[in-house]
């Protein structure tokens, strides 16, 4: 049945589809069937830097992706417990965004499905619960399933999580569900609270998307009485609510954190938490306030159910469905610790087996309270796909020397040697004795300018400031120079610091003051990432690509802006200082204007809410400790309505702290895939999160400030573990799903051949590159239709290719494409049609007809 389900989902008709809060409707002609380029192996990484690799050939562009491709188918580092990679987004950052998700235009309200209600209640059940026809006719099939899921939660008087990927329409699914529960008629809209015994609905969301909720209600369900509890009119809205004049109340997380005692006293019928992952920290005041809400019908909406730690999963489910995952201690001992220990690279087989059993048990439990779908399994057949490349750029010689001086500073050496015995002969550690304070350090002296005896957290108070400096050096040396906007005392401290780390190179870098020279700032010679970016962009621009360029640093955006001006590129820019009323016009202009080549975006200000589907290249200039932030930035371009293949380039400075940032991202994403999706992941790392016994290569202060200049840290880890990708658990899974071990092993072996392109990559200033998809989630829980159709017949050929060392990558890629075409041709011949005629039939056929065709074909193959 899984095979039939895969075929059914991937070959859905691409006709007119309904819109949602983030789904745009296009006509059948606009959704011209196109083929997503085949996924390549790592050894073809250079080809991925060339656009010609991604664009389908003239012949292939006439065949849809569904016709060919879909057959194949945080941290406890020190006593102060600094959680730099797990902290919640500050409300100040939220305010800086103030930009809602894209709304829908009037032209996008064409009906695309049968104008009939969606029945939710069982036959004979009274009252009859249904989604109004005016809403149901615009829903996609996966959205209807989401509405049914939420209604089942509601009917059983408990909460749950709608964990769909960003861009799958969680907002409209929620509105459709509420319209059904409150008995709204899409045409008359007469039902109201005065005639109902139900209480009101509370929606809590980031302040940046409050307007979006208002807008979506007005477009999809204007019959609801919606009010916003935010700002100066709170008292008036509260009185209106008590008078039963409000059906839906929308407020921000920050407002609810402050006004929780007032709002928690109201008998809410349903509470919706949008971006529910904000409830990941059980010690936050927001989480404590949300626990006081009386109703059991709590629904969380989030595309990132788990971001940093498995314990976040418990916190979120403890809010939506208290007790569903047991006690906190039980969850930690039964799920959290075994899953992490079983993921160690050298974990004993017994630990791996226990982790696998606990993973399956947790998955079966989560499915009762969570529905999660990805773009690939829902609307993937309507999109051209995305490829996520991680590019390790060679730092300039000056950058490397400055980085080396930085890690030799007394502050960092104090942290690295904190556990060593003190030189004075005391039995205490250095950090508890003579090296608790660092009076000779520039950074320490500034932090403790008012207290020369240090603070209670010394020396661990130095961790975060030192990490920030290392990240700035990894991006651009100008970033560590004094900022003219800072206070004079801080500028003086920064000047002393710069003088120390620049050393004898100070004149080459223009002195210790911030440069005002346009030519100096726009020059790429002292920045490894900009040198690589210059060559990559030249290739993209020449081929008509449009680029999104993200950075967390506004100062870095200033430098990149000067670089773009110097190169003569036409660009737009959006950051926290961009007025809210101008942001949508900037987005619309970029999407509509072919002359706009680059969009410079602050990741904090534009990581959420922007719809930039005209861009097909996304550059993440600086990585974040939280992997979801980088993924959200990618989704500005990779969303419904994108008609081109999206290629993402994450730029990292090789041999720097950024490699550790990325490897921790990999670790966190793997944990999320294991705990949330029940997938199998390659065991790359020896480190175990929040475990001092197994800090390995990832965790602990010593790893943060390790010198990686003489090695390729990430590359070494990948190469070390490439031969262990198919462990015993994966072998069992592969055999169960009909894919041979040799077949899978050959695929993995052919994915790692970086030596072949090293000379050309070096010319681009790139030391190493790989595709993120090749590192994360190599082991799938299910296999594609084509893999099952293949059977074991080609095993001998694959063994032969493996013995040859996969030397002819280009021939293999061509062979794969031919195999896919041949399979599709076989289906067409079985149907008695030419390929183009069969393509039209696939797009117009009902799911039942397609399913029947596949059943008949499989019977014939057998």
From Swiss-Prot:
Residues 274-294 form a coiled coil. Its EC number is 3.6.4.-. Keywords: ATP-binding, Coiled coil, DNA damage, DNA repair, DNA-binding, Helicase, Hydrolase, Nucleotide-binding. Pfam families: Helicase_C, SNF2-rel_dom. It is an enzyme of class 3 (hydrolase). A motif (DEAH box) lies at residues 274-277. PROSITE patterns: HELICASE_ATP_BIND_1, HELICASE_CTER. One of its GO terms (biological process) is DNA repair. ATP binds at residues 164-171. Residues 85-95 have a biased composition (Acidic residues). Residues 532-685 form the Helicase C-terminal domain. It comes from the Eukaryota. SUPFAM superfamilies: P-loop containing nucleoside triphosphate hydrolases. Residues 151-323 form the Helicase ATP-binding domain. Residues 13-43, 58-95, 782-821 are annotated as: Disordered. May be involved in early DNA damage response. Probable chromatin remodeling factor. Belongs to the SNF2/RAD54 helicase family. This is Switch 2. It comes from Arabidopsis thaliana (Mouse-ear cress). The lineage of its organism: Eukaryota, Viridiplantae, Streptophyta, Embryophyta, Tracheophyta.
């Amino acid at each position: 049945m899984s095979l039939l389900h895969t075929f059914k989902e991937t070959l859905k008709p691409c006709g007119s589809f309904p819109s949602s809060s983030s789904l745009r409707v296009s006509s059948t002609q606009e959704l011209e069937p196109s083929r997503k380029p085949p996924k390549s192996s790592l050894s073809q990484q250079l080809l991925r830097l060339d656009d010609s690799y991604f664009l389908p050939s003239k012949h292939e562009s006439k065949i849809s992706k569904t016709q060919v491709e879909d057959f194949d188918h945080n941290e406890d580092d020190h006593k102060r417990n600094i959680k730099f990679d797990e902290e919640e987004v500050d409300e100040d950052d939220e305010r800086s965004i103030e930009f809602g998700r894209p709304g829908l235009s009037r032209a996008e309200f064409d009906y695309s499905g049968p104008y009939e209600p969606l029945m939710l209640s069982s036959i004979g059940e009274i009252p009859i619960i249904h989604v109004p026809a005016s809403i149901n006719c615009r829903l996609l099939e996966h959205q209807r399933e989401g509405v049914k899921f939420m209604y089942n939660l509601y009917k059983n008087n408990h909460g749950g999580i709608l964990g769909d990927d960003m861009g799958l329409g969680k907002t409209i699914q929620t509105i459709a569900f509420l319209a059904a529960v409150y008995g709204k008629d899409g045409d008359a809209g007469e039902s109201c609270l005065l005639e109902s015994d139900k209480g009101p609905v509370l929606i809590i969301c980031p302040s940046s998307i409050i307007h979006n909720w208002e807008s979506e209600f007005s477009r999809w369900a204007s019959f609801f009485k919606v009010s916003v509890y935010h700002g100066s009119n709170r008292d008036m809205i509260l009185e209106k609510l008590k008078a039963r004049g409000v059906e839906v109340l929308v407020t921000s997380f920050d407002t609810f954190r402050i006004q929780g005692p007032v709002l928690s006293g109201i008998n809410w019928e349903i509470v919706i938490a949008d971006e529910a992952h904000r409830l990941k920290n059980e010690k936050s005041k927001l989480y404590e306030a949300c626990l006081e809400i009386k109703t059991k019908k709590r629904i969380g909406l989030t595309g990132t159910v788990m971001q940093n730690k498995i314990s976040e999963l418990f916190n979120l489910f403890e809010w939506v469905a208290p007790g569903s995952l047991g006690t906190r201690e039980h969850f930690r001992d039964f799920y959290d610790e075994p899953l992490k220990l079983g993921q160690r690279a050298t974990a004993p087989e017994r630990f791996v087996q226990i982790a696998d059993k606990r993973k399956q048990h947790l998955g079966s439990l989560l499915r009762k309270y969570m529905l999660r779908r990805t773009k690939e399994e829902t609307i993937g057949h309507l999109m051209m796909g995305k490829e996520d490349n991680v590019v390790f750029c060679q730092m300039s010689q000056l950058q490397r020397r400055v980085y080396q001086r930085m890690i030799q500073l007394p502050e960092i050496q104090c942290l690295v040697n904190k556990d060593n015995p003190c030189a004075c002969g005391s039995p205490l550690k250095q950090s508890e004795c003579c090296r608790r304070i660092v009076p000779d350090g520039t950074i320490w002296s500034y932090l403790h300018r008012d207290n020369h005896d240090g603070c209670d957290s010394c020396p661990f108070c130095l961790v975060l400031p030192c990490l920030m400096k290392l990240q700035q050096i990894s991006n651009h040396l100008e970033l560590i120079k004094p900022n003219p906007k800072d206070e004079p005392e801080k500028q003086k401290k920064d000047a002393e610091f710069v003088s120390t780390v620049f050393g004898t190179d100070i004149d080459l870098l223009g002195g210790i003051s911030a440069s005002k020279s346009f030519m100096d700032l726009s020059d790429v010679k002292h920045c490894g990432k900009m040198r690589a970016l210059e060559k990559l962009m030249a290739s993209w621009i020449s081929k008509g690509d449009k680029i999104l360029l993200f950075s967390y640093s506004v100062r870095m955006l200033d430098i990149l802006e000067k670089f773009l001006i110097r190169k003569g590129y036409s660009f737009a820019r959006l950051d926290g200082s961009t007025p809210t009323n101008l942001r949508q016009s900037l987005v619309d202009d970029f999407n509509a204007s072919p002359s706009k080549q680059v969009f410079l975006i602050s990741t904090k200000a534009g990581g959420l809410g922007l719809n930039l589907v005209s861009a097909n290249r996304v550059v993440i200039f600086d990585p974040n400790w939280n992997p979801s932030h980088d993924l959200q930035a990618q989704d500005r371009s990779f969303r419904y309505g994108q008609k081109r293949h999206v290629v993402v380039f994450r730029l990292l400075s090789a041999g720097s702290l950024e490699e550790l940032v990325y490897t921790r991202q990999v670790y966190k994403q793997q944990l999320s895939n294991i705990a949330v999706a029940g997938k199998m992941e390659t065991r790359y790392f020896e480190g175990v999160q929040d475990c001092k016994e197994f800090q390995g290569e990832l965790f602990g202060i010593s790893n943060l400030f390790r010198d990686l200049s003489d090695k390729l840290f990430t590359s070494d880890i990948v190469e070390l573990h490439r031969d262990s990708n198919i462990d015993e658990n994966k072998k069992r899974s592969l055999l169960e799903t009909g894919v041979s071990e040799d077949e899978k092993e050959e695929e993995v072996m052919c994915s790692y051949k970086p030596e072949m392109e090293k000379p050309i990559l070096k010319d681009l200033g790139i030391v190493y590159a790989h595709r993120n998809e090749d590192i994360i989630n190599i082991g799938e829980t299910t296999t594609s239709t084509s893999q099952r159709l293949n059977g074991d017949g080609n095993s001998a050929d694959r063994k032969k290719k493996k013995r040859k060392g996969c030397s002819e990558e280009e021939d293999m890629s061509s062979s794969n494409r031919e195999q896919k075409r041949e399979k599709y041709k076989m289906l067409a011949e079985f149907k008695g049609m030419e390929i183009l005629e069969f393509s039209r039939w696939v797009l117009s056929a009902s799911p039942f007809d397609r399913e029947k065709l596949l059943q008949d074909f499989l019977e014939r193959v057998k």
